[in-house]
């Protein structure tokens, strides 16, 4: 609760005395995730995400694979991980999950280009894609920077509606897109 975005979680790649180490962090995070995986199993949840936008941890492939395996011991439904926008082709362990999940905060005029890029990842891993976060604020200019939660300006419901229309239209033509989780923008 220090206000730092989880994408900034990072440690030295080699153990350094007096510094938090990846092994200890992943052990703690795995315990956290397996606790919630057991709850998700008990409640009959339809999908379990092992993390979201943890960009600086994604290169720790061995640890992520072990965490996903531990989650699968507790939760028997589909499992994934949600990468940040533009990060779909940076995760090397999509084969360990059931779908490729991403934060779909792409500019209104760039959806087709981004879907072309993401399609290559979907084909490589033979996995559908879920935009488990997607959305755009109702502020003038937000369709160009839909992930900017600090954007200030004039209310513009039409710009927000145009962004959603573009996203849904572009994705409707791509059978490998399995769905969306719409972020709670105003």
Q: Where are each of the predicted segments found?
A:
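A solvent-exposed, charged loop/short amphipathic helix patch at secondary-structure junctions
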Residues: 16-20, 139-161
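Acidic-and-aromatic substrate-binding clefts and catalytic sites of carbohydrate-active enzymes
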Residues: 26-30, 55-62, 86-90, 107-112
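Aromatic/hydrophobic pocket-lining residues that form the small-molecule binding cavity
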Residues: 29, 33, 64, 111-114, ...
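Active-site neighborhood of glycoside hydrolase catalytic domains
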Residues: 31-32, 42-47, 57-82
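C-terminal/domain-terminus segments
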Residues: 63-66, 148-150, 179-186
């Amino acid at each position: 609760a220090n206000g730092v975005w989880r994408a900034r979680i990072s440690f030295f790649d080699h153990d350094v005395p007096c510094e938090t180490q990846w092994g200890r962090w992943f052990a703690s995070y795995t315990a956290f995730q397996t606790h919630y995986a057991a709850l998700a199993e008990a409640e009959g949840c339809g999908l379990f995400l092992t993390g979201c936008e943890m960009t600086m941890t994604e290169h720790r492939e061995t640890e992520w694979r072990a965490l996903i395996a531990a989650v699968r011991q507790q939760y028997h439904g589909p499992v994934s991980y949600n990468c940040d926008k533009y990060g779909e082709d940076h995760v090397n362990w999509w084969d360990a999950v059931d779908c490729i999940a991403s934060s779909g905060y792409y500019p209104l005029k760039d959806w087709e280009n981004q879907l072309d890029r993401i399609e290559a990842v979907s084909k490589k891993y033979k996995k559908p894609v879920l935009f488990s976060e997607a959305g755009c604020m109702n502020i003038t200019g937000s369709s160009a920077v839909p992930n900017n939660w600090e954007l200030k300006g004039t209310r513009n419901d039409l710009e927000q509606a145009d962004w959603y229309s573009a996203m849904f239209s572009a994705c409707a033509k791509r059978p490998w897109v399995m769905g969306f989780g719409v972020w709670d923008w105003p």
